């Protein structure tokens, strides 16, 4: 220690701090030189190794800590490696999917920049998709690309027609003559060839011709099928069906003498020979699958062995690119080969344990058994081979390279033998289930089979599809069917090479067993490189897949069994592959027994067409493969798929030889070409300095304008939208773009107007602009005058101000205007109130009596009134706010989805907002509606029910009833029709307080009751407002508040009737649709939508109110979903219909739609009927005419309902049943309107039309000879005539006593005369004095169908048949006490801040 101190010179540096600690140093020295420490001499290497081995062996001792820790480490390591592997596979799959998307999007038409950023966007959503779903998604994108191309082509066509319109509009009035346009379309239609005419739409028929332009006799009695919108559509369809029926009947006759098993095979194989592109048939034929009908001689127990049944199971032969494997499959223990990650295959099993041979590599063919020992190929007339198998169960043989091995199995379940390399061996397996044998490298195995049936001498030899072939096996009593060439479905299996594991296994497993019966059994799958690589969607150069094609369904048999499984053992193999293998689900249908086999359905497109007959499409052009995308085949699956699914074929970037500009005309052509005349005139007035005080008012009500962007149909002229749509409807979707060019060229050459016509058109345009300008000015001056928003002006006040015009010089002239106008009846105070429309009419009459140009005089009068009405800035702001609030009530009604709840809510919100903002009050309010007093008539004929109120008053007011014998002033308001204001309710003795818990000291406030009036000034309810909850001592309503509350009552009345008018229209639509479905069968669904204004940038939206299916079951949405224009680019035909107010025929998603507008009285569309007719190109002519009848009746009913609610027409009661109530009347208006039209049409008939029916039975022999009608048909026609006439006679009320004993037809004939016709033309079947034997009439009519009546082709029978059915329907409805169809009820929302009654008012108004 001292030596260290001296060495470090620590003694000389005593004053310097140091880190040297002598104690620590001394201790360390002593520890290092401890004499008692003995150093370990060490161990040998042998001892060290043995010790390590011992420690390692301890980990294998069960139930020890080391053992458990070792197992945990192994599992952790295994899971970590698995996660790393899965992550690597996901990266590979994501890369390949991205590449597939990039290749797929080359199908889309690119914009000028040549980029589609959506590829990157979609890539983030497909990461977790299964392989099958991803391929279906790719196919969906293919069809979307095809539809997108069609949209571009349609946009190009519409742009060409728009340019044509501008060229033909030489006067620049933005209108073309409609009749001249239709005449040119007829001329172009007539000069076209028959082939072209079959693709065009007939311009002489509806929808080109309106119902008002068709005579009644022609509308109801024209049954000439040649006048269909598609020329000879019915005849062509009937001819095709007859040819198919004859072909099928001949085939059945040929097979009658064949054995049952062979006959079934022939039928089933024949059904697969037809093209799989049929798109127009019944719902059973919409999927591209066909049921095979190979059947045995009987049904045996499912679990009996092959030896007991004397038959073996069938097999599914699945062939790879360079090898093929035979698969034996049973009904209960069959197996299915499933390949790769996320691949699945479905195998159909018959009730006789039959089998289906399927083969791949872009073709379908029968798999010929390999040239090995003991195999016999048996071929049928359809070149199908059947090979008999020994009594073994479920064995699978796999083929190597030019060697074969047999696998013998005992009666176990689903075992599979695994083979070695380059040698043939037989392995017997027992007591094993679900094992999978796979072979390493290029070897093929063939199952040895003992021939049990001789080869058919008439069978043809099967050509070899590849160098190696699979086999088809079947038992002696169980048949299998396979179709050659393109007439057979196949299962294509392709495998890739895989490395052999070091442990000696045959290779990592790529396939998984999929159980069909007892979920036991398997199919061995082998891997190997193929001669041709195929995939449902090709990702890269090394990509392969299993492709299994479904068959076309020819019978509705059992449902398809599809099983999809994911093989967990396939994940290690993916690491060795450079590309992902995809597989397509094989869809096979079950085989039915002979007893249950239905007749094959007729497919239109299976008929061989005549060489002279043009190929007329009978289905939608834009049709996808039938069924959902899941049922369709993927692009690239096979050669036949690519031929059928043209949407998945490569497409050029040019459309009709032109590169797309990247812009759509339909998106902005309204801005460029379509201008609102009202907006233009409003802009001109706002630029005029003479009307400065009206500018703010005009801007306000232009902002609050309702629905914009619709063209009204006027029947005289066509604007740009209507012209383009008319031409687009004419050319249809099946014509070429060149035909549209020819049509445009034809129009440009032949459309011309004379000088007088141009001058007349310009004059009409000027008058229209002047009329709109006058209306805007008068509406603005009315709103400025009505500063408090009451909705009315006092006539005396208006006269007093008008008479001062020009210092009274025009006083006498103005008084003359009162002689030409009918003012409303004066109120009890002798005041005449003018509404906005009445005020405008009155001023126009006053101006017409003054000297000078009417437009200049009117502007002078408006300028005078504007200067005479002085309003302060505060009054102007208050007027602006109140106008906005009143508009919100109407807006709530228009966007309510036919519900009153939003109207009630918005009404109370407006009342409370105005009371707080302009009166500094807290109010309570409730709405009472008049109802008929049914239960207590002694307390008054009517009662007032509180249907809505503010939330605080709900426990005391809501749903309470006020009778006439109770205290209150509400019935006084109802009787007098004017508001009543009680300033202090505590001093009034006739006020009824709903809250009985309130003390009399709290009865401090004002009460105001206002009448609710309809368009005819009839009272239907009361709006009550009070200030009992206001804390202020003085809370009296001021005059401007009372006037505004009158405006609120008026706005609520308008909104209330708006909702109920739409509700009644919806009620009538439902009735009409149900009638249509009762007489037609070709319509799938009918969707009813109403137009509503939009709060967004769009002009309007559609609300899906109701969907009715073919059974007449209607789904009514209480909260209807909204359809926006931007969200339905592939279904834009709905908005085309509402934009133009014209009928649209379009295709969407492979289905044909007929979009029919529901027009309001201004001829603008207020709704739409979307008629879906499925995959048919068009309805039959009879159904098409019945659709027209339904549409015409609904439109007439809508005009009547809307006119009654708006006050434009008076309500008329035609039949007695209409007085039963508003709701019930709305439900029968459709039948009443049809009854009226039928009676009017019967009156137009000549007497000889009825006489010819009486003589029909005497000339039936002549008809049978001249018209080539069989005797049975003539007798059926005679029975039809007799029964219809008997049914009509039974409605006669003049001689009903003499009709009871009639038995022979000779006695019935005496009652058919002109008096009977006159009687049925005015008969009211619902009258109380009309007595009809309904059961007897029904017995005569119900035996005859609608089709039978139509085929008779007689207008009298047609009219009488409909007349009888309508009368019976009205009688049935009249006998019911309740309403058979209830319109949608107002929804009740829990989030509403106002209370609304859940019970519906009957609304029986006085």
Swiss-Prot record:
Residues 258-294, 322-334, 342-354, 362-373, 382-393, 402-414, 422-434, 442-464 have a biased composition (Polar residues). Ca(2+) binds at residues 786, 788, 790, 797. Residues 255-655 are annotated as: Disordered. Keywords: Calcium, Metal-binding. Residues 564-577 have a biased composition (Acidic residues). Residues 465-477, 578-598, 638-655 have a biased composition (Basic and acidic residues). This is EF-hand calcium-binding domain-containing protein 5. It comes from Mus musculus (Mouse).
């Amino acid at each position: 220690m001292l030596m260290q101190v001296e060495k470090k010179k620590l003694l000389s540096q005593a004053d310097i701090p140091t880190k040297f600690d002598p104690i620590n140093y001394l201790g360390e020295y002593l520890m290092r030189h401890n004499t008692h420490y003995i150093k370990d001499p060490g161990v040998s290497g042998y001892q060290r190794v043995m010790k390590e081995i011992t420690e390692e062996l301890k980990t294998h001792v069960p139930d020890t800590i080391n053992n458990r820790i070792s197992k945990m480490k192994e599992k952790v390591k295994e899971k970590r490696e698995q996660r790393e592997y899965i992550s690597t596979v996901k990266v590979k799959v994501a890369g390949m999917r991205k590449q597939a998307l990039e290749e797929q999007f080359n199908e889309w038409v690119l914009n000028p920049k040549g980029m589609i950023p959506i590829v990157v966007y979609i890539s983030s959503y497909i990461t977790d998709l299964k392989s099958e779903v991803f391929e279906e998604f790719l196919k969906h994108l293919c069809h979307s690309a095809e539809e997108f191309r069609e949209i571009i082509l349609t946009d190009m066509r519409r742009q060409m027609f728009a340019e044509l319109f501008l060229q033909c509009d030489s006067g620049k009035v933005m209108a073309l003559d409609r009749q001249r346009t239709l005449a040119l379309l007829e001329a172009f239609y007539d000069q076209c060839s028959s082939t072209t005419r079959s693709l065009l739409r007939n311009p002489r028929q509806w929808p080109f011709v309106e119902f008002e332009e068709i005579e009644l006799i022609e509308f109801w009695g024209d049954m000439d099928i040649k006048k269909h919108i598609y020329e000879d559509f019915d005849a062509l369809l009937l001819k095709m069906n007859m040819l198919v029926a004859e072909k099928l009947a001949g085939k059945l006759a040929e097979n009658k003498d064949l054995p049952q098993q062979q006959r079934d095979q022939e039928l089933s194989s024949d059904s697969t020979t037809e093209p799989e592109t049929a798109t127009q048939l019944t719902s059973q034929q919409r999927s591209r699958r066909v049921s095979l009908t190979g059947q045995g001689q009987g049904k045996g127990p499912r679990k009996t062995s092959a030896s007991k049944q004397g038959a073996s199971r069938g097999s599914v032969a699945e062939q790879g690119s360079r090898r093929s494997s035979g698969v034996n499959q049973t009904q209960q223990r069959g197996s299915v080969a499933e390949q790769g990650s996320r691949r699945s295959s479905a195998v159909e099993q018959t009730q006789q344990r039959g089998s289906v041979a399927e083969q791949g590599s872009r073709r379908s063919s029968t798999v010929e058994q390999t040239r090995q020992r003991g195999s016999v190929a048996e071929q049928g007339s359809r070149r199908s081979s059947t090979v008999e198998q020994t009594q073994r169960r479920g064995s699978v043989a796999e083929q190597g390279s030019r060697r074969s091995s047999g696998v013998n199995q005992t009666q176990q379940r689903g075992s599979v033998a695994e083979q070695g390399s380059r040698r043939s061996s037989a392995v017997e397996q027992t007591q094993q289930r679900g094992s999978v044998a796979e072979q390493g490298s290029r070897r093929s195995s063939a199952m040895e089979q003992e021939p049990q049936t001789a080869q058919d001498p008439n069978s043809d030899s099967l050509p070899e599809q590849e160098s190696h072939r699979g086999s088809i096996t079947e038992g002696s009593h169980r048949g299998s069917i396979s179709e050659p060439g393109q007439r057979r479905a196949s299962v294509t299996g392709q495998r890739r090479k895989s490395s052999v594991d070091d442990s000696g296994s045959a290779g990592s497993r790529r396939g998984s067993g999929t159980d069909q019966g007892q979920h036991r059994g398997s199919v061995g799958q082998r891997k190997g490189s193929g001669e041709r690589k195929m995939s449902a969607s090709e990702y890269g150069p090394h990509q392969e897949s299993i492709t299994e094609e479904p068959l076309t369904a020819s019978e509705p048999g059992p449902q398809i069994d599809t099983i999809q499984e994911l093989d967990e053992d396939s994940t290690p193999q993916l690491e060795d592959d450079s590309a992902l293998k995809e597989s397509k689900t094989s869809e096979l249908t079950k085989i039915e027994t002979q007893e249950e086999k239905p007749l094959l359905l007729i497919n239109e497109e299976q008929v061989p067409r005549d060489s002279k007959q043009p190929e007329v499409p009978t289905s939608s052009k834009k049709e996808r493969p039938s069924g959902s995308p899941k049922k369709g085949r993927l692009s690239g699956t096979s050669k036949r798929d690519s031929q059928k699914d043209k949407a998945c074929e490569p497409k050029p970037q040019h459309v009709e030889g032109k590169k797309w500009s990247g812009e759509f005309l339909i998106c902005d052509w309204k801005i460029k070409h379509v201008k609102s005349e009202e907006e233009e005139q409003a802009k001109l007035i706002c630029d005029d300095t003479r009307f400065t005080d009206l500018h703010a008012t005009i801007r306000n009500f232009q902002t609050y304008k309702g629905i914009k962007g619709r063209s009204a149909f006027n029947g005289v002229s066509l604007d740009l939208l209507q012209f383009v749509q008319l031409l687009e409807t004419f050319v249809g979707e099946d014509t070429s773009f060149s035909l549209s060019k020819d049509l445009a060229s034809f129009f440009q050459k032949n459309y011309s107007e004379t000088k007088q016509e141009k001058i007349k058109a310009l004059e009409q345009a000027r008058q229209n602009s002047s009329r709109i300008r006058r209306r805007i000015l008068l509406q603005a001056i009315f709103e400025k005058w009505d500063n408090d928003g009451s909705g009315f002006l006092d006539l005396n006040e208006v006269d007093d101000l008008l008479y001062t015009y020009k210092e009274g010089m025009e006083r006498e002239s103005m008084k003359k205007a009162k002689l030409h106008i009918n003012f409303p009846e004066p109120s009890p105070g002798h005041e005449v109130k003018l509404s906005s429309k009445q005020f405008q009419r009155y001023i126009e009459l006053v101006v017409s009596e003054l000297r000078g140009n009417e437009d200049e005089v009117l502007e002078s009068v408006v300028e005078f009134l504007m200067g005479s009405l002085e309003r302060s800035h505060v009054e102007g702001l208050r007027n602006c706010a109140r106008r906005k609030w009143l508009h919100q009530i109407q807006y709530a009604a228009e966007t309510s989805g036919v519900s009153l709840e939003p109207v009630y809510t918005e009404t109370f919100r407006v009342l409370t907002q105005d009371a707080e903002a302009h009166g500094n009050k807290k109010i309570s309010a409730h709405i009472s509606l008049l109802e008929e007093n049914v239960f207590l008539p002694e307390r008054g004929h009517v009662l007032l029910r509180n249907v809505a109120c503010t939330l605080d008053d709900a426990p005391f007011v809501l749903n309470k009833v006020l009778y006439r014998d109770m205290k209150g002033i509400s019935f006084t308001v109802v009787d007098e029709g004017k508001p009543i204001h009680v300033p202090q309710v505590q001093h009034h003795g006739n006020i009824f307080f709903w809250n009985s818990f309130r003390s009399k000291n709290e009865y401090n406030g004002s009460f105001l009751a206002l009448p609710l009036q309809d368009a005819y000034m009839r009272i239907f309810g009361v709006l009550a407002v009070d200030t009992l909850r206001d804390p202020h001592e003085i809370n009296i309503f001021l005059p401007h508040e009372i006037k505004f509350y009158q405006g609120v009552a008026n706005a609520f009345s308008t909104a209330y009737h708006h909702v109920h008018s739409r509700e009644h229209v919806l009620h009538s639509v439902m009735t009409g649709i149900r009638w249509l479905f009762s007489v037609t069968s070709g319509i799938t669904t009918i969707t009813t939508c109403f137009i509503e204004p939009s709060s967004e940038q769009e002009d309007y939206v559609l609300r899906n109110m109701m969907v009715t299916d073919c059974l007449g079951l209607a789904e009514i949405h209480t909260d209807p979903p909204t359809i926006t224009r931007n969200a339905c680019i592939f279904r834009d035909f709905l908005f085309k219909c509402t934009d133009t107010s014209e009928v649209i025929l379009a295709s969407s998603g492979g289905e044909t739609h007929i979009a029919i507008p529901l027009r309001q009285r201004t001829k603008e569309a207020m709704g739409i009927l979307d008629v879906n007719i499925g995959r048919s190109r068009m309805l039959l002519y009879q159904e098409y005419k019945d659709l027209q009848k339904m549409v015409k009746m609904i439109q007439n009913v809508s005009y009547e309902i809307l006119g009654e609610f708006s006050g434009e027409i008076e309500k008329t009661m035609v039949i007695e049943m209409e007085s039963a109530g508003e709701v019930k009347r709305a439900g029968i208006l459709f039948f009443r309107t049809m009854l009226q039209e039928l009676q009017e049409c019967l009156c137009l008939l000549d007497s000889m039309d009825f006489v010819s029916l009486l003589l029909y039975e005497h000339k039936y022999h002549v008809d049978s000879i001249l018209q080539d009608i069989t005797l049975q048909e003539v007798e059926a026609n005679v029975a039809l005539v007799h029964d219809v006439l008997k049914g009509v006679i039974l409605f006669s009320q003049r001689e009903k006593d003499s009709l009871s004993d009639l038995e022979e037809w000779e006695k019935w004939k005496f009652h058919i005369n002109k008096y009977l016709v006159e009687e049925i033309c005015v008969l009211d079947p619902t009258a109380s004095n009309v007595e009809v034997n309904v059961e007897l009439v029904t017995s005569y009519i119900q035996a005859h169908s609608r089709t039978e009546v139509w085929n008779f082709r007689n207008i009298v029978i047609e009219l009488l048949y409909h007349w009888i059915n309508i009368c019976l329907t009205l009688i049935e409805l009249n006998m019911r006490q309740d309403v058979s169809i209830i319109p949608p009820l107002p929804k009740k929302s829990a989030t509403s801040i106002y209370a609304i009654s859940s019970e519906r008012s009957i609304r029986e108004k006085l």
